[in-house]
A protein has these predicted regions:
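Active-site loop of classical SDR/Rossmann-like NAD(P)-dependent oxidoreductases
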Residues: 33, 267-279, 293
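C-terminal helix-rich "cap/oligomerization" subdomain common to oxidoreductases
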Residues: 65-68, 217, 281-318
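Predominantly a Rossmann-like dinucleotide-binding segment in NAD(P)-dependent oxidoreductases
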Residues: 122-196, 201-202
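Rossmann-fold dehydrogenase core element
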Residues: 104-121, 140-145
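Beta-loop-alpha module in the N-terminal Rossmann-like domain of NAD(P)-dependent dehydrogenases
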Residues: 45-108
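Hydrophobic residues in well-ordered beta-strands that form the structural core
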Residues: 51, 91, 116-118, 249
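N-terminal Rossmann-like dinucleotide-binding module
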Residues: 1-45
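Contiguous beta-strand/loop segments that form the cofactor/metal-binding neighborhood of enzyme cores
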Residues: 173, 179-253, 279-289
Length: 318
């Protein structure tokens, strides 16, 4: 299967690392903004074609699908472009930064009949899969999720510490992970959702601190704290408080409430959530089925984000 990866930055390269471990998939073209860095990344991964034009990449012989790891503000437009070209698409989280654009992506997916998937990685991290499997088996019920998403980003840098050409967003990007995961793990949509935000950064023009509270009909609650001001370990730290144990998840690692590490061997074929996410995308294409984290399945998360956005009076997007 020949695919296009759009985005030569930190996250695009995470996808390229994962795809390199998946048999039967070849990256036919890499799309990037800065052509010098795009050329270098293409050479590093042995990709035969690179370009700054998504349409040119999609037109390469045999291309069936595209993975978009481009700036958030480009996701909706590029996603529609890929689908209207008759190609399957996986869009990194968030698929859009408005509910209207997310709804449009789903409408275009239904119209074209291609597969459309969001890069909701937390559904695929072995740590969260372990919890989900126990929930599905009736062995566990989430009572509360306590989550902290922390970075130190007072300048516009990406996950690799390089200058970023776009501005990240606590609500529409980082909160999207936890909002979706909370609703996925409880199997319900939040009926109570409130958010507050701290001051805007004078240059970045986005909130640097945010707090979110959610509740689903079965009574489970979620407390989410987010910050770009935290001078410490970065990433998202999840505490699952359940009826039958407490669990601490950090990316692909899991421990119990007393910090005893849990062996995740056998949960999935890899310990890399990005790779597992991409495996699901390619499997759905081959098997002609709806993927986990399809545009339809993630729309409830986008609706909750829209509710939270309105609760804060419409948080500015850079």
């Amino acid at each position: 299967m020949k695919v296009v990866v759009a985005g030569q930055g930190a996250f695009g390269q995470k996808h390229l690392d994962g795809i390199a471990r998946i048999d039967g998939v070849e990256v036919a073209s890499l799309v990037g903004g800065n052509q010098e860095s795009t050329k270098a990344v293409a050479a590093k991964y042995g990709i035969p074609h690179y370009t700054g034009d998504l349409a040119e990449a999609l037109a390469q012989p045999g291309v069936e699908a595209a993975i978009l790891a481009t700036p958030t503000q480009m996701h909706a437009k590029q996603g529609e472009q890929v689908m209207r070209a008759g190609k399957h698409v996986e869009i990194e989280i968030p698929v859009a930064d408005t509910l209207a654009d997310a709804e449009r992506l789903l409408a275009v997916q239904k119209e074209t009949g291609v597969i459309g998937m969001g890069g909701h990685t937390r559904r695929f991290n072995p740590s969260h899969q372990y919890i989900h499997n126990k929930i599905v088996a009736g062995e566990l019920k989430v009572l509360q999720m306590d989550v902290q998403t922390y970075f130190f980003r007072r300048t516009n840098m990406n996950a690799a510490g390089n200058p970023r050409s776009w501005t990240d967003h606590l609500l529409w990007h980082h909160a999207c992970h936890t909002v979706d995961l909370f609703q996925y793990q409880t199997g319900q949509t939040a009926t109570v959702a409130h958010a507050v935000e701290g001051p805007m950064h004078p240059q970045l023009k986005v909130s640097m601190d945010m707090g979110i509270l959610m509740k689903v009909p079965n009574g489970a609650i979620c407390t989410l704290s987010l910050s770009f001001n935290n001078d410490g370990p970065f990433g998202t730290f999840f505490r699952y408080i359940c009826d039958n144990g407490t669990y601490l998840a950090y990316y692909d690692d899991l421990s119990d409430g007393k910090n005893n590490k849990i062996d995740l061997t056998g949960v999935a074929v890899s310990f890399d959530g990005i790779e597992l996410q991409d495996r699901e995308f390619f499997a759905a294409i081959k098997e002609k089925r709806e993927p986990n984290a399809s545009f339809a399945q993630i729309l409830p998360a986008m609706r909750t984000l829209d509710k939270l956005d309105k609760d804060m009076g419409g948080s500015p997007r850079a």
